[in-house]
Amino acid sequence: MTKFNLEQALQGAPVRLNNGFKAYIFADVSLLAINEPYPLIGGYAYSISSFYDNQEHQRFEECRWAKDGKCDRLSALGSIAGMWED
């Protein structure tokens, strides 16, 4: 797996999370919010099967990360493991 590269990610390259999902970083707000501990904003999409209509539905989960790729949540599964490789 390729090491996390913030510059590539901000240019649209996907990243791989510790949970295996492909995520994208949309913005770095560190210049607007100087002391923000998690200035990287992005997220990932995933599918779920509905209990009610037995169909697949797409969901989007917003995430925030520190510049080193650590997620703002208690679980480390949302942290960035590296760059996405097909």
Swiss-Prot record:
The organism's place on the tree of life at top rank: Viruses
Name of the protein in its database record: Uncharacterized 9.7 kDa protein in cox-rep intergenic region
Source lineage: Viruses, Duplodnaviria, Heunggongvirae, Uroviricota, Caudoviricetes
